Amino acid sequence: MPKRVADEIAALPEPRGPLRRPCADLSRRVRLLAPLLDHLPASSSSSSSTPLADALGAARDLLRKTRDGSKIDQAMRGDAFLDEFAGVNRQIHLALDALPYNTFHMPQEVQEQVALVHSQFQRASTRTDPPDTQLSMDLAWALTDNPSDPALLTRISHKLQLHTMADMKNESIALHNMVISTAGEPDGCVDQMSSLLKKLKDCVVTEDHANDALTTRSASIKHRSPIIPDEFRCPISLELMQDPVIVSSGQTYERSCIQKWLDSGHKTCPKTQQPLSHTSLTPNFVLKSLISQWCEANGIELPKNKQNSRDKKAAKSSDYDHAGLVSLMNRLRSGNQDEQRAAAGEIRLLAKRNVNNRICIAEAGAIPLLVNLLSSSDPRTQEHAVTALLNLSIHENNKASIVDSHAIPKIVEVLKTGSMETRENAAATLFSLSVVDENKVTIGAAGAIPPLINLLCDGSPRGKKDAATAIFNLCIYQGNKVRAVKAGIVIHLMNFLVDPTGGMIDEALSLLSILAGNPEGKIVIARSEPIPPLVEVIKTGSPRNRENAAAILWLLCSADTEQTLAAKAAGVEDALKELSETGTDRAKRKASSILELMHQANEDSLKGNGH
């Protein structure tokens, strides 16, 4: 039953609308539970009434409700919906708490993956992300402004992903169904929602009519074409620009024209005759948008690029056409440091913008070229290159290409010697690549853990957290736990634990909890006088930190009576009793187990004194 529900969730279409991020996050976490669901005992896997089955069913129902529901309603009542997502995440977290998955016959890596996902559900059970404040402000303005600003309505429709009349029809049906299902007006705002929907419809109709009229208007004004503003003309061809780019002098030209000028060997700006400091071409997106708006307003269709089918596909799916990408690759290959720095910086920004850019940039052959630039002597080029690889790695298919290009040793070297921002982004890149299990082994073997620990100690607040996240993910693999312990991470984590002003207690406890499950890690932690800080966290920490501290203390006490007696002497019993009654299910179990160990140790001590 749980497996079937998880499969149904995986089959749901990509989420749309203002709640697409929490929907995507919830779906992703459920998919990561697949290995656990494959190993459930027969009684649990076939039952339809277990806590896990109920929780996954609630997740499926919420995702379906969000998919089919009113996008306007979801935006206007964002807080309530986000609370629902937090509640479902909490329900799954508690169901996993009650499931003794550590007793299942699963590979160690699967056990650790499930534990990691379990912790993700726990974190998601408490709301941290606020609703989209800009969208909330836009909605409030649109509901009071009559008539509404078309640009405002366009921005709202983009955020809600209500672009076409078909989208509007579905939204109208969703609002109608919402009224029927609630037998009235939910929160008394149906009139407002309907009013806003009408404004959005009018906006879409106006745009559709404008688009439909383009062909007719173009035909009727051929004999009286409007005068093209000078700033929209290329200074070389004097024709309307379709792909404006900026050169180092600050002037804007049509890409194909200025590229021909540069390819002919010219090193000056055609208009000002200034020497060009470099030949990089930066897209002028603002001017391109203004030209597009002017063309639409005047019924003019932009001239089409003369491209083959592959080029057209690339142009539609990314911010660059094929020629532009080829130019970027050539600049990466050039021996000119200024060219390489500018090109790497351009790719860094493009790869950050959208998934299509990441795909097209990788297909153009950028990854090996960027990997080569990791060895650049120019710090800024190095920073651009590693950050571009980080942004490209967001697309799953690019991860393998980056690793296959032998990037990991070079990223590790950058992590050791780069500037602070470069080191931070190198750590984030290693974390992104380590999502793939086999890469955890490769990254650890390349010597990444010692420089990550250095960043953990001397980095900026962001750098420390990037390093901690990367180390945690790498330590899901047992061999990397040993590497981290041998590299001396424990003493630094203990220092974080006793420094409440450092802001790293959460990360320290998470890392200690995973390291304490390793025999060598447990020994080193036990030698680091862990009892006083752990007891303090159990007494005064947040619910999550108390749970982790109890888990670490249980691992230490279960194999060492001296640690048990030391914890008892430190006065932790009352806090453990309170935790065993009011904590999370996992915290209750750990606290109760420690209390039993203390009771047993006390009895053994009395018997020893009696002899």
Swiss-Prot record:
UniProt domain U-box: residue ranges: 227-301
GO molecular function: ubiquitin-protein transferase activity
GO cellular component annotations of the record: cytoplasm; nucleus
ARM repeats by residue range: 355-394, 396-435, 437-476, 478-517
Pathway the protein contributes to: Protein modification; protein ubiquitination
EC number assigned by the record: 2.3.2.27
UniProtKB keywords: Repeat, Transferase, Ubl conjugation pathway
Reactions mediated catalytically: S-ubiquitinyl-[E2 ubiquitin-conjugating enzyme]-L-cysteine + [acceptor protein]-L-lysine = [E2 ubiquitin-conjugating enzyme]-L-cysteine + N(6)-ubiquitinyl-[acceptor protein]-L-lysine
Functional summary from the UniProt entry: Possesses E3 ubiquitin-protein ligase in vitro.
Name of this protein: U-box domain-containing protein 12
Organism: Oryza sativa subsp. japonica
